[in-house]
Structure formats: structure tokens, C-alpha cells
């Protein structure tokens, strides 16, 4: 903002001084200032708002000072406009009028009523039902020689609050996993914002905070105060010093943004990396777990195929499950057994789906109720959702799955609060508090009495109307109401001469006159007093109900977690049965056996007349790397991805697309697939490729699964082949991970002769007289042809280009390459006209030297000397 409040105070209007005082407290926020029926922004904020919302930038008079820029929008549309600003990365402060302007003595009193940032919002206009919205804090600390990174992330709409204590180099993977909307950094670490901008979407906001907020003492005090405890040992986070500081920063920031009703955030949990697999950005992207590489949407992703959830809580948890596969066999097996039971018991599964579908978003409803942002209809929905729990509990309490039984036994049916909501909120309640009438009759005696007074008084109005019609002989006389004039008698202009003297005129219209009388005034006072008191009492009762619901936060959140997990297991069962998946066996060993595996996404999008071709995959102690060669478009990349996805599905506890599968537990899945430039970071295709390859070699273990596709494609042939060869040797000799390596370097097939652990496989083709058919079947043995020309033909290359490519390929294979040149070539292809030989420079020199020899005039000694020269030339000495 290009204005200094201190310097302007004398000449600004009182309202602008009020504005500037508020703006001074929130300089980094867009300030929306309520003026009448509009929210206005001024100065530099106005320019930003005008540009972001594409609304008119105008000017406002400012007393003796110069006119100032102004942009605004109607107050009733504020939620949509604020959502647009926040989605564009702005942080917004809302300053409202907190008294009736007509009752104000002088300047209307205004206060900050809301602060909205990308990471702190409850608005449905901003949030996605199926996505978490995380606020995240990062803290980098050093104790002695140990350097640690703390990550804390919270979704204020669901009360999920977690921390992770990491090595600094692990932070990027964590951020890419949680995908926060806003990140809090210390001023000391603000340079890390450059890293954030490289690894996260552009709209993620980085907020820099004062360094003192990142002290251990400050953080501990904030956490202990929030959770009302004197020690953090009971939370299991006492030793995670950097993560604990990050958690304190999150809570401090929420307080700074006026989030002062956070009683519903009742838990904080430590993320244990030993329990879950870490998926880096490349793996998530290359396997298309959550989104498609084509357009970034869920269409074409694993999530789209697997997601059969019935409510938003389950949908959000399913995303988290897919991004955090399990590494504990007992947890995996518990999910698999539950899915098996739900598949076998179709009637139970159907009834469960009906129950889950009737449950609304308990987590987000609770957060809005606890912060007094909720409306009566949402409270009613929460109550009706709780009413579904007994049926779900009864349905699964005798289940054949221990996990399902344990889950439903943990449900708290909350009979008392459910009954209170049922008796308090009218089923026909309006969407807004101002609509009134949402508290049921019989819930509160005082409210019933006030409503009776109002109702009886309104009946009295009808009696007055009938009496006045008789007295005046005006049959069209009506008693009506509006907010400006209150109750009045309306008489048409044609009948105005019949109006008696005791009528007091209130308003003149084009076609009518409006009056009042003493009796009407008395009733008006009774009605308005009763209505006003009734409305105030309703709001008070509703607020008290919200407080009572908030007191049950722990129980409601526990129910929400259970419902979400049941929903995910139900989703697994639905897709597993529908798609013919099988229950995998997950073991502690390092083997892997998949019989007739299928790609879970590709098989769903292929045409009916083009069935997906299944393939086997096998690893044991002896066979650790499958070197897959074969033509382009023959299915090598799909084969790699399908096996990665099958392993991932098994370890998230879902059945898998195969005839049978035994999965040796995998600690991480690494992928290096395709080529992509990171030009915004100044990184070429090859550098990106090498960075990703280095990450794999440095972090993979003997329990990992590595998927490599076309390593070395971003550089020269010999460089690329050398790197691919060396990587293969290193993985087998040092790392020992199960590896699928798809390559167009057919020379790598020779590695099978050097390593017992490497086996050659190829994607089969059938050659006919005029074309090649890709069978997409992976079989034992190496391939010696990539059939690139056939792929070019399928892509629609002109037939002349295809024919010429075949001739050039034939020549190259014979080391006798001939390319036509000259003006005669324009528009025509003449394979045998005017030829030149293309040799490497050394070969050209050798050829010229041989052609220059005149063997008819040489003596035997001359011939030997010339032969020696040719040897030197061939050896590079010439």
C-alpha cells in the first residue's frame, strides 16, 4: 500500500482513518472494508482486487486529500468473490460493520470478523469435498551435530493435525505427498521458498513469519495451552523437537488469524515413516496414482478406477491411503481380510453402502459448528448422520473380519446429542439463520410463548383489517408490512376520499396511500418486540446447541474416522468384485510373483473388442532384474507401470488385477519413466533424467521395486547406453532391488551373460509381408529390433518418408548409407541418383587414403610401408 497512515491522518476522512488503522495491522492481507451494502478495497488493494476479479477500478473522494482508488462488490456475494481471491493466492481480511449505521453516533464501529487464507478457510466455495486443505509449517533445527526438519500440517476443516520429524532431504517428498495450500516459514529459512516454488503448484502460498515464533519454548507453551496439558509426553511427540516447534507455529498462526474457537482440534499425531511407504513426486506422477499426466485431472488415474466411496470423508481418506501405502503386513492383511468378507457378503455390502451414503461430512460439519459458521440445516444433517450409526454397527458387529468388528465396536452412538438435535432443529429449517423458525416448537417454553404472542397479534391484525373495511366501506383495504415502514394500511388512490380523519398518513405512492392508526401501532409494537426477542432467543439457543455439539468433538471425530475407513474398505470391495481382482498374498520375503497381471486403468478404458493382454512378472533371490526390450508401442512401459500399480494396490490393502499375486513387501517404489524438461528451473531433459536416476540409486534398498524406462535417452547413444549399462550393474551389485528395466538399447541384453540375476524379456511382435502386429505379450528372451519405422507408419507418416527410412536403415545396417541430395531431390525421392557416402571423419580419411594408393606401381616394401600408415590412421594416429 502506497500510503503512510501517520502522514495522512490530518487530511483523511474519519472513515478512511479507520480503514488505514486496520490496514496497518494487516499489511500483507487484502482488506475488505464493509461500507453500507458493499465490501470495498482501497489504494493498492483496490488495484489488486480489480485485476484479480476483473471488476471496475473507480475512485472515492477522501475529504481534503486526493481521491483514492477503490474497487468493491455487494456484501451478499462476498463468499464467491473472496473464494476467487483466495484461489489466486491472496490472503483476505474482512472488516465488518458491527453496529446498525442508523443507530450509530458518529462513525460506524467496525471490527475484523474473519481472516481467510489458502490454508485457513471453511468456505465451500474454496474447498473440495474430496480433497484435504492443509496448512503446513516447516522448521529446520540443529541440536549438536544433528540437523532435523519438522513438518506440521493441519486441515482446520477436518481437525486432522499431524507432525513429522525428518531428515532435511526428506521434506520435499513429504510436501509433495500432503500438497499443502499454504506453508509457514521462518524469516531465517525464507530462501526455502524457492524450493517450494519448484516442487509445488504455483498457487501454493508461502507465508514468512518472525523467527521468534520458531523457538522451542514458545512452541511448547502454545501446544500445552491448546491441549490443556503440562507435558507433551502423552502425545508421543516429546522427542520430535523440530516437528513440535512446527506444530506450535501452526497453532500460533491460527490464533493470529483469529481462529479462536479451536476446541474441536483435540488430537495431534506423529507420522511414523516406518509404517508407510514414501512415494516421491516422480512415482506418483509416472504411475498416475491420483491424477493423469495428460491433463492433471483424476480422469485416467488409479484413483478414478478405485474410488467407489459413498461420502466425502471416505473419498479424502482413500486419496491418503493411495499416497501412503502400508509397510506393516498385519495392517495390510487386516484390510485385505475385511475386503474379502465384504465381497463374499453381497447383501451386507449393499446395506453398508446405503448406510454410508446417508452420512454427511461429519468432519467439516463439526468444524463449522465449533467455529459458529454453521447453519441450522447443517446441524440437522449432522444429527441425521449420527442416526445412521446404530444400523451400521448392528450390520457388522458379528462380521467375519476382525477389522470390521473392531471398527464398529469403536462407534460412539451419541444418543443424547442426537436426540437433542432431533428435538431442537426443525426438519424444514431454512438455509440461513436470518430466515428464523428453525428451532422446533416444544424445545423451549419461552420461545413458544414469544411465538404465541406474535401469532396471536398477527391474528389480531386480520381482525383490525376486517373492522376497518367495515368502517370505511373500502373492500380492498389491506394491512401490510415492510422493513422500512413497519405495518401500515394501504388504500388505493381511487378510495382515498373515503379515508377517515383518524388515519395518519405514512407514505404516498403513485397508485396508493399508506396510513397507520393507534390500534395498529400497538399491535406493531407487540409483534415486532415478540419477533425480535424470538429471533434473538433462537440464535442464542442455536449457539448453545453448537457448544453442546462441540463438547462431543472427540467422539464425532472418532466416528468420522471409522465411517471413512469403512467407506474405503467398501470401495475396495466394490471395485475388486466388479473388475475381477484377486486377493494378493503379502509376505516378508523379497520375492514377487504376479500371474496374468493387468493394468488397472488401461483395462478399464480399452474398447470391448480389444481385450487387455495380461502378463506375468516374477522375481526371486536369483532373478532380480528383468531387462525388457522390444518395439516401441509394444507395451513395455505399460508392463512396468502395471506391476508398480499391482504392488501399490496390494500394500494399500486392496485386491489386485491378476489371476494370482504374491508380493514380497516393498519399502519404496521408484520410477524413472519418459523424458521431460524442467525449463523453469533451467534443467534439461537429460539433467532431469539424471537427477531422478541419482535419487533412485542413492535411496533404493534391497526391498525396493525399481521401474526404469528408457534410461539415457536424453543424451548421445553411446553416453546413454554406457550410463544405462553402469546403472544396471550398480543396481545388481550394490542395491539388489527388484528391477524392471525397459530399454531400446538392445546391447544391454548382453548383461544376462554377465549377471545371473539379470534375465532378458521382450515384447513380442508378429511380422507379416507388409506390417508388424504388436501382441503386447512379454516373453523370455531379448529383442533385436525396435520397429520404429512401423510405429512411424502407424502414426501417419507419408509413405515416401517411410520407404526412404527403410532404405536408409538398410544402408546403415550394412554400413553403406546413401542419401540423395541436390535440387533434383525437391519433391521426389531418388534412392540411386547422385550419391555421397556418410562416414565418420576417421573413416573418411582412411577411405581416401586407400583410394589414393596406386598398387600397380608399388614395390613389396612400399606396400608394407603404406600398410603401416593405414594401420596408424585406423588407430587414430593420422
From Swiss-Prot:
GO CC field: cytosol
Gene: mutS
SMART domains with a match to the protein in the record: MUTSac (SM00534), MUTSd (SM00533)
Source organism of the structure: Chlorobium phaeobacteroides (strain BS1)
Protein name as it appears in the record: DNA mismatch repair protein MutS
Gene Ontology terms, MF aspect: ATP binding; ATP-dependent DNA damage sensor activity; damaged DNA binding; mismatched DNA binding
Sites where the protein binds ATP: 630-637
Pfam family of the protein (one): MutS_V
Keywords tagged on the record: ATP-binding, DNA damage, DNA repair, DNA-binding, Nucleotide-binding
